[in-house]
């Protein structure tokens, strides 16, 4: 009991221990939850098999639901950790608060919950509520039921012949398992109807079938002929001379005279039979051979785990694909699941800004015209048209001046910092590039050092100027930038944000993830890393230091499909291609 007092459910935050109303404690990898909190949590899907996570509930999903429950307040106690939601009024509450306030739980299908006001009612229930019967007796504990109320008693919907305490019925159902029958009419439909009355029925053998020496009588030799028609004149127990009694070679619980077997099976007298199998064992062997293959592996091999696999039941819904993503930090490890994946070290782009993009420039043509048309209103989209045919532009006489230099060297050219910051132009602007300078001119060169400005830049010019410099020096120069780092820039992390939760001794770092583990691939989402406050790797929380943090698989807390700014960049590229630009 002292160990149970130290336990706290990760979902509901309560430490109550009652197997009948909260279910057994499920403990895996220091994760402790009530089993009924797993089943009845409205937004927690069961995406694994009986050997995955905790009876089909993946550890990642459990921690994700626990983190989401910390944002929900209970309708009754006004505390966080509410994971159950009324299927009709959508009010949230704890499992414990629901039990105390007469909520109804369905332990089948989608495992729905209902508050007291929204509980399902039919004509029979309304009749019991308006005119409750008197002098009822519980057939399990043989105690009187002082008042028949639906939240404290159950009844057999198959026959409606009596009532029983809900607590007694929970113990009876937990003990009986497959063998649960209606205690009034012995109907098998009772198992399905009782699950709608807040009673959990496990799909397993009865507990008395698993007790020590439960089948002791099967190991005792029963030297008595069990054939329907015993032919021995001295009786069924006679075991001498030619009337030898043989035991079943499988169970040893059934025996028969050899002569009785020969007569019953119509075997030839010359054939001497030394063993036989009773009809019950033959039927069991036949069903095992025809049934599906079963595995004898344990659910959890770790000795520290505490999970009873016999409690496994299947839960339908909610659909995991439609669940809302959350940025709340949760564990991401997944236990023996088809959906689990290896943790990959994330590499980053060389840009410190997450919005940076590389532009691949096509080989220069003889004449390249870049036109940016008028835009009536500010827009983050940019139209660029490449025309390979020369077009005349207005210019003054430049017979005595050298050829025009590269656009990036013109001192008065505006240089916006982002695609969304391109100002409205009063007229169409064209850049005429001299083919003699194509081998020496670099347009829109993006340095390979971190830039705090934009994803890309465009140099604009409306006319040419006299340039006294020699033509050999007309080479585009990159803007001033810090010296290149010595390490490979692809090893840097692409940061999104960093934060701390009040009351938690942890620091959370959100980074972007890319396909194939490199920033050259497509962004696939974000990853939340969790570090302790005293971790020496995050003592320096500057951007440059966080980009160079060496992460391990244990640092991964959760993942999300939110791609942030990369989602907008991809939409811009799709629009750009849809307009016919290349």
Curated annotation (Swiss-Prot):
<feature type="compositionally biased region" description="Basic and acidic residues">
    <location>
        <begin position="383"/>
        <end position="399"/>
    </location>
</feature>
<dbReference type="GO" id="GO:0036335">
    <property type="term" value="P:intestinal stem cell homeostasis"/>
</dbReference>
<protein>
    <recommendedName>
        <fullName>Pineapple eye protein</fullName>
    </recommendedName>
</protein>
<feature type="compositionally biased region" description="Polar residues">
    <location>
        <begin position="340"/>
        <end position="363"/>
    </location>
</feature>
<dbReference type="InterPro" id="IPR013083">
    <property type="entry name" value="Znf_RING/FYVE/PHD"/>
</dbReference>
<feature type="region of interest" description="Disordered">
    <location>
        <begin position="292"/>
        <end position="311"/>
    </location>
</feature>
<dbReference type="Pfam" id="PF13771">
    <property type="entry name" value="zf-HC5HC2H"/>
</dbReference>
<dbReference type="GO" id="GO:2000035">
    <property type="term" value="P:regulation of stem cell division"/>
</dbReference>
<keyword id="KW-0479">Metal-binding</keyword>
<dbReference type="InterPro" id="IPR051188">
    <property type="entry name" value="PHD-type_Zinc_Finger"/>
</dbReference>
<dbReference type="GO" id="GO:0048749">
    <property type="term" value="P:compound eye development"/>
</dbReference>
<dbReference type="GO" id="GO:0005634">
    <property type="term" value="C:nucleus"/>
</dbReference>
<feature type="zinc finger region" description="PHD-type; atypical">
    <location>
        <begin position="72"/>
        <end position="119"/>
    </location>
</feature>
<feature type="zinc finger region" description="C2HC pre-PHD-type">
    <location>
        <begin position="6"/>
        <end position="44"/>
    </location>
</feature>
<feature type="region of interest" description="Disordered">
    <location>
        <begin position="323"/>
        <end position="422"/>
    </location>
</feature>
<dbReference type="InterPro" id="IPR011011">
    <property type="entry name" value="Znf_FYVE_PHD"/>
</dbReference>
<dbReference type="GO" id="GO:0042078">
    <property type="term" value="P:germ-line stem cell division"/>
</dbReference>
<dbReference type="InterPro" id="IPR001965">
    <property type="entry name" value="Znf_PHD"/>
</dbReference>
<dbReference type="InterPro" id="IPR034732">
    <property type="entry name" value="EPHD"/>
</dbReference>
<dbReference type="GO" id="GO:0035019">
    <property type="term" value="P:somatic stem cell population maintenance"/>
</dbReference>
<keyword id="KW-0863">Zinc-finger</keyword>
<dbReference type="GO" id="GO:0008270">
    <property type="term" value="F:zinc ion binding"/>
</dbReference>
<keyword id="KW-0862">Zinc</keyword>
<comment type="function">
    <text>Required for survival of imaginal disk cells possibly by regulation of cell apoptosis. Required for germline stem cell self-renewal through mediation of BMP signaling.</text>
</comment>
<feature type="region of interest" description="Extended PHD domain (ePHD)">
    <location>
        <begin position="6"/>
        <end position="119"/>
    </location>
</feature>
């Amino acid at each position: 009991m002292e160990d149970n007092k130290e336990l706290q459910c990760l979902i509901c935050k309560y430490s109550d221990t009652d197997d009948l109303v909260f279910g057994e404690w499920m403990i895996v990898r220091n994760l402790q939850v009530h089993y009924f909190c797993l089943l009845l949590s409205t937004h927690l899907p069961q995406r694994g098999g009986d050997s995955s996570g905790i009876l089909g509930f993946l550890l990642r999903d459990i921690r994700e639901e626990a983190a989401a429950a910390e944002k929900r307040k209970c309708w009754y106690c006004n505390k966080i950790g509410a994971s159950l939601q009324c299927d009709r009024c959508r009010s949230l509450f704890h499992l414990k608060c629901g039990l105390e306030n007469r909520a109804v739980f369905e332990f089948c299908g989608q495992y729905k919950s209902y508050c007291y006001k929204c509980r399902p009612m039919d004509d029979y229930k309304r009749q019991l509520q308006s005119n409750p019967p008197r002098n009822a007796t519980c057939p399990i504990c043989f105690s009187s039921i002082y008042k028949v109320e639906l939240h404290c008693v159950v009844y057999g919907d198959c026959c409606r012949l009596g009532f029983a305490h809900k607590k007694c019925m929970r113990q009876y159902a937990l003990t009986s398992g497959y063998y649960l029958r209606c205690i009034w009419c012995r109907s098998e439909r009772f198992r399905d109807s009782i699950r709608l009355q807040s009673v959990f029925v496990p799909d397993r053998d009865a507990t008395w079938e698993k007790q020590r020496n439960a089948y002791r009588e099967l190991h005792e030799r029963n030297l008595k002929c069990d054939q329907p028609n015993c032919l021995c004149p001295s009786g069924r127990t006679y075991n001498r001379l030619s009337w030898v009694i043989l035991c079943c070679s499988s169970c040893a619980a059934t025996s028969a005279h050899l002569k009785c077997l020969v007569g019953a099976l119509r075997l030839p007298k010359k054939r001497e039979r030394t063993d036989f199998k009773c009809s019950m064992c033959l039927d069991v062997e036949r069903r095992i051979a025809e049934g599906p293959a079963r595995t004898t592996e344990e659910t959890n091999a770790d000795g520290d785990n505490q999970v009873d696999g016999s409690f496994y039941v299947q839960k339908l819904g909610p659909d995991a694909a439609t669940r809302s993503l959350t940025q709340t930090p949760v564990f991401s490890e997944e236990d023996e699941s088809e959906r689990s994946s290896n943790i990959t070290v994330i590499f980053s782009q060389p840009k410190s800004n997450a919005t940076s993009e590389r532009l691949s420039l096509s080989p220069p043509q003889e004449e390249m015209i870049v036109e940016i048309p008028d835009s009536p209103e500010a827009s983050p989209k940019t139209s660029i048209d490449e025309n390979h045919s020369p077009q005349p532009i207005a210019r003054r006489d430049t017979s005595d001046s050298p050829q025009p230099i590269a656009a990036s060297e013109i001192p008065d050219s505006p240089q916006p910092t982002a695609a969304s910051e391109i100002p409205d132009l009063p007229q169409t602007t064209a850049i005429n590039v001299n083919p003699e300078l194509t081998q020496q001119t670099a347009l829109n060169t993006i340095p390979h050092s971190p830039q705090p400005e934009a994803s890309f830049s465009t140099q604009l010019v409306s006319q040419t100027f006299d340039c006294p410099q020699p033509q050999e020096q007309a080479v585009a120069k990159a803007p001033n930038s810090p010296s290149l780092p010595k390490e490979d820039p692809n090893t840097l992390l692409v940061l999104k944000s960093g934060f701390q939760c009040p009351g938690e001794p942890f620091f959370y770092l959100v980074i972007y993830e890319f396909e194939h583990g490199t920033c050259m691939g497509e962004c696939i989402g974000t990853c939340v890393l969790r570090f302790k406050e005293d971790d020496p790797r995050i003592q320096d929380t500057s951007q440059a230091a966080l980009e160079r943090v060496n992460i391990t698989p244990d640092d991964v807390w959760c993942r999300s499909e939110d791609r942030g700014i990369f989602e907008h960049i991809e939409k811009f590229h799709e629009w750009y291609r849809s307009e016919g630009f290349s």
